[in-house]
Amino acid sequence: MIRWLRSHPLTGFVVLAYTGSWIFWVPFIPLQKLIPAESYKPAAAGVGQLALLAGPLLASLIMTRLTTGSLRAWTSSFKRWRVPPVSYALALIAIPAAIMTASAVLPGKEAGTPSFVGPAVVIGPLIQGVVFLIGGPIQEEVGWRGFALPVLQERIRPLRAAVVLGVIWGGWHLPQFFVSAWDTPQNNVTDVLGFFAFTITGAVVMSWITNLAHGSVLLAILAHNSINWALVTWSCLRCLY
């Protein structure tokens, strides 16, 4: 098994990432009906975190260790913060601006009761940014952009590598379509195809930023967090107008 993983780094990573996450996600699908309403969201959040830790994060640790003999490359990518300033501008400003602009222009659900009122209009989005950061991007990006992207780019050109990674990333989310507590569109096949279009587009943008930042996983994490933050924060703020 170890020999096979070493000789098939990309496939090995994908198998480990999917298995590690799905082993938590898939059983939760039938079990969710047995969970009391008041415990449903905390249970779903807990299972989601376990899946993130056991999926792309653990897979990247295992594969980095097996393919390089150490975790030095894994940890050094976190510390790579001295990168071109344009990388930060794209990750922290351009992405949220683009998503919020698109959300304002494109048709969506009718606005409901505002989630943020008073001082919370400022404080709420800041807190959300921190919560989202530790709730997914860190665990995911050490795997997707930290391990899988460089391996793919050794074989194919960056743009094609990003598209392939977007499909892999989208497929990894599939069990989430069957759990209402997880923020994944669940209405029809069009929603699924739209989600894959979103993950492919997101993968292209985040891979571009990561490459601009000389492979910095830190910038990939910030870019991923900006996507999550902008999507949710806009839905909270649009109710005010």
Please name every model-derived segment.
Residues I2-P137, L165, V232-Y241:
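Specific transmembrane helices
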Residues L10-V14, Y88, F147, A161-A162, ...:
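Alpha-helical transmembrane segments and their helix-entry boundary regions
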Residues V26, V163, N187-Y241:
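Functionally important transmembrane alpha-helices
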Residues T101, A148, G202-M206:
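Hydrophobic/aromatic residues in alpha-helical transmembrane segments
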Residues I123-G129, F178-N188, I209-N211, G215:
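Short juxtamembrane and helix-loop transition motifs at transmembrane-helix boundaries
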Residues P125, L133-I138, G170, F195-I200:
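Residue-level hotspots within the lipid-embedded alpha helices of multi-pass solute transporters
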Residues Q139-G166, S207, N211-S216:
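Membrane-interface helix/loop boundary segments of multi-pass membrane proteins
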Residues L159, G166-N188:
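Membrane-helix boundary elements
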